[in-house]
Amino acid sequence: MNVLIVYYSMYGHIHRMAEAVAEGVREVPGAEAVLRRVPETLSPDVLEKMGAVEPQKAFAHIPVATVDELASADAIIFGTPTRFGNMCGQMRQFLDATGGLWVKGSLVGKAAGVFTSSATQHGGQESTILTFHTFLLHQGMVIVGLPYAFAGQTRIDEITGGSPYGASTIAGGQGERLPSENDLAGARFQGRYVAQIAAKLNG
């Protein structure tokens, strides 16, 4: 069973979460996690000014996703940073190229989930995932979130990401906060849970 993890990461926070999601997927017998990043849309000059060139070298080895790969996956988990309460433009552009899959119904019935990151605690994580769900519903996919069976999302002893809608992390205003162990545990849980649901859907 092929679980595709498609994401965009500018400074590495979503990449680290994607790795944790993949770890969770691989805990399910017979499940294979495949990491892919969506194409970059910003110019090298802009990335340089944003301080993103060096951080992105850490995951430059991850192959760039193609739309056709979505159709061949048994389940898909998407990762995007929050941009003003919505998914990032790179992910939006990638998804906008899936019209052919929609016409064919290629994604109908596939399990799907979303994880995200934001600079602040209340920086739009939930709205980002919920608006992403609109795309999944239009494609006929089966949405899988992060249930409260993952108790880590109810912790109040530390700043933490995660909601019933999906795993998440808080990066800090300057990207100085890396995903905590609790954030990563939520990502692993969601990866494992999506793979488990996909296995049931695929019989």
UniProtKB/Swiss-Prot annotation:
Q: Which GO terms describe its molecular function?
A: flavin adenine dinucleotide binding; FMN binding; NAD binding; NAD(P)H dehydrogenase (quinone) activity; NADH:ubiquinone reductase (non-electrogenic) activity; NADP binding; NADPH dehydrogenase (quinone) activity
Record note on cofactor: Binds 1 FMN per monomer.
What does the record give as EC number? 1.6.5.2
Class of this enzyme: oxidoreductase
- Binding locations of NAD(+): Y11
Positions annotated to bind substrate: W102
Q: Which UniProt keywords apply?
A: Flavoprotein, FMN, NAD, NADP, Nucleotide-binding, Oxidoreductase
Q: Which NCBIfam families match?
A: flav_wrbA, PRK03767.1
Q: What protein am I looking at?
A: NAD(P)H dehydrogenase (quinone)
